[in-house]
Amino acid sequence: LTTSADANTTAFDVLAIGRSGVDIYPLQTGVGLELVESFGKFLGGSAANVAVAAARLGCTSALISGVGDDPFGRYVSGELVRLGVDNRFIVVDETYATPVTFCEIFPPDDFPLYFYRKPSAPDLQVRPENIDSAAVRSARLYWSTVTGLSEEP
């Protein structure tokens, strides 16, 4: 990792901001959620997925997002590290739970999603003071979701 002019800031190849959460996928396909007997738990959220993809391609990556102060939030934070993403910009929110998304799998191309993010989500509570502006300025690529612009903290 290289550092920017600010000695405390790492210059990332990719710095993503936006959704992170837990995706719950059925381990059976072709049946509705009401008939599924077992599920798998996976890191989810578009921004988290982008950061992980960049890390898998050998880039240094970090994520700016929020998680709840709950077991799923700890899972998200730990999975990011395990998958090679710097998690120092993950904000833990004590008010809102970490979002969970369920998916049904009907091959070849029907994958209904059910988002549990209401009344709000921790990634929508990230405030300007939670964002390291030097990290944003020094990143080779800054990637943002549009969802993050849909609600003010």
Listing of model-derived features with the role each one plays in the protein:
Residues F72, V76, D86, Y96-T98, ...:
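Generic hydrophobic, aliphatic-rich segments that mediate packing or membrane embedding
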